[in-house]
């Protein structure tokens, strides 16, 4: 490994074990780890059901960014190179162990007015673009 580098790797099912070399993506890992079956049970359907979002992709991306930042902080203190390893399956295990909200599917949708303060409208070549506003503004990034 190049000295002084922070290296982040992602795998579908983990970096060790019999499935370490298998390729995969969020939907496959959701199915292989039982999330789709649990979603079907919660929704009252007979069989698996897809989740409403690619939660493993999103959460694992946050873990990758956090791991890279922590490795850089450690590198600033101690020097050296650091390797951060994350996997979709381990993220799924972590999320699974958080537990489930009873009647979580019965939660009412937010009305559009409730999110309006957090959305901005920007002009684009395709017309008005609506996006979530930045969560913070830093003096050096403006």
What is the role of each PLM region?
Residues 1-139:
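Active-site-adjacent "lid/gating" segments in soluble enzymes
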């Amino acid at each position: 490994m190049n000295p002084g580098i922070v290296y982040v790797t992602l795998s579908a099912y983990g970096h060790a074990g019999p499935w370490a070399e298998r390729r995969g993506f969020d939907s496959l890992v959701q199915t292989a780890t039982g999330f789709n079956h649990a979603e079907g049970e919660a929704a009252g359907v007979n069989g698996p059901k897809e989740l409403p979002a690619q939660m493993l992709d999103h959460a694992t991306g946050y873990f990758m960014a956090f791991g890279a930042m922590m490795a850089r902080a450690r590198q600033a203190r101690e020097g050296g190179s650091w390797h951060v390893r994350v996997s979709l399956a381990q993220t799924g295990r972590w999320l699974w162990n958080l537990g489930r909200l009873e009647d979580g599917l019965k939660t009412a949708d937010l009305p559009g007015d409730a999110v309006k303060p957090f959305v901005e409208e920007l002009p684009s070549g395709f017309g008005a673009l609506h996006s979530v506003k930045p969560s913070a503004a830093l003096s050096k990034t403006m």
